[in-house]
């Protein structure tokens, strides 16, 4: 197992899966306009491209050279700089993983719930959004234990509804509560749910003990580790929910998300505890903090979340972002032409 602790591939293959869309692509915009309502057109902020995706690949090449394979899931889009001749990367079109009658789709929740259908995907894989970046050296042990369990943190939390997306979180928790007794889960696996690695966040779980059902888990916006067999099992247990979400072309209050599979891994103790502070989520408006974290490597992983800022401000912020990544990762990676 010594190799697993170093920067080698370890005793089993680990793949990376990342979703990406170029929201400025005219062909894609025309396709989206055919199916979208006015409200959905106004949600275009979710599809804005930062222009930094090549740095995602450069970070993988530099900080996780041990990764077995990278699967890029797109909708008939391939970055013009990506070297598709590289045997370590595969571009997966939605047609390869989604039901035919669900296409085209513009619902990331639907796409995420079907990534286990990727041909050739390894049993152990890590899922990234395209706004999640490796920020310094990582090892397989950051994502999986030596016996193949995903690394995660089972910190409990409560839903504080603000937007439609919170309905989806409630949908996930509802299915968990319908199938698992909270107190039985905690009694069987106390040290998975109350662990020194969680630090002061254990207080949240303690405060929620009087509630007889799960109210939510903390959802750190970092790459998530999965086992494909567990992913498939959960979806087969909830085929109706899977099918409904898969056929919602746009985000819908009735959707379930990939966090359902994560929650299942937690309540069945099919994970090993990891600090929840391994990564950090920033809103794009927090540019000073983002630049500092990128330059210092404070966190191993960061998420740079878009928010409702004007296009002028967005352009200025992404310009700073590109400059910062260019300085940190100036060399082309093996994934580029």
Swiss-Prot record:
InterPro entries: Stealth, Stealth_CR1, Stealth_CR2, Stealth_CR3. Its EC number is 2.7.-.-. It holds the Pfam family Stealth_CR2. Keywords: Exopolysaccharide synthesis, Transferase. It is an enzyme of class 2 (transferase). One of its GO terms (biological process) is polysaccharide biosynthetic process. It comes from the Bacteria. GO terms for molecular function: transferase activity, transferring phosphorus-containing groups. Belongs to the stealth family. Stealth proteins are part of a protein family that is conserved from bacteria to higher eukaryotes. Family members were first identified in microbes as proteins that help pathogens to elude the host innate immune system. Microbial stealth proteins are involved in the biosynthesis of exopolysaccharides. Stealth proteins are predicted to function as hexose-1-phosphoryltransferases. This is Exopolysaccharide phosphotransferase cps2G. It comes from Lactiplantibacillus plantarum (strain ATCC BAA-793 / NCIMB 8826 / WCFS1) (Lactobacillus plantarum).
């Amino acid at each position: 197992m010594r190799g697993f602790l170093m920067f080698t591939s370890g005793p089993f293959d680990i793949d990376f899966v990342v979703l990406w869309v170029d929201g400025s692509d005219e062909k894609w915009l025309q396709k989206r306009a055919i199916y979208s309502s006015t409200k959905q057109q106004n949600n275009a902020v979710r599809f804005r491209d930062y222009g930094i995706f090549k740095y995602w690949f450069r970070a993988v090449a530099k900080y996780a050279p041990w990764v077995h394979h990278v699967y890029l899931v797109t909708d008939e889009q391939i970055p013009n700089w990506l070297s598709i001749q590289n045997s370590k990367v595969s571009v997966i079109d939605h047609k390869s993983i989604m039901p035919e009658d669900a296409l085209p789709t513009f619902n990331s929740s639907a796409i995420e719930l079907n990534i286990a259908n990727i041909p050739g995907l390894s049993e152990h894989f890590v899922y990234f959004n395209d706004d999640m970046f490796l920020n310094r050296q990582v090892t397989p042990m950051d994502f999986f234990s030596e016996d193949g369990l995903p690394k995660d943190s089972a910190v409990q939390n409560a839903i504080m509804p603000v937007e439609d997306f919170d309905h989806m979180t409630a949908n996930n928790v509802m299915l968990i509560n319908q199938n698992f007794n909270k107190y039985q889960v905690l009694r069987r696996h106390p040290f998975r749910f109350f662990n020194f690695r969680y630090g002061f966040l254990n207080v949240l779980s303690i405060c929620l003990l009087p509630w007889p059902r799960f109210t939510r888990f903390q959802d750190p916006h970092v790459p998530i580790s999965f086992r494909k067999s567990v992913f498939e099992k959960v979806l087969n247990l909830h085929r109706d929910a899977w099918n409904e979400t898969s056929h919602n072309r746009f985000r819908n209050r009735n959707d379930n998300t990939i966090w359902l599979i994560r929650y299942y891994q937690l309540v069945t103790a099919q994970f090993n505890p990891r600090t929840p502070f391994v990564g950090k989520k920033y809103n794009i408006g927090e540019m000073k903090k983002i630049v500092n974290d990128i330059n210092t490597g404070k966190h191993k992983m960061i998420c740079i979340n878009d928010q409702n800022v004007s296009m002028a401000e967005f352009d200025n912020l992404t310009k700073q972002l590109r400059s910062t990544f260019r300085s940190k990762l100036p060399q082309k990676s093996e994934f580029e032409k």
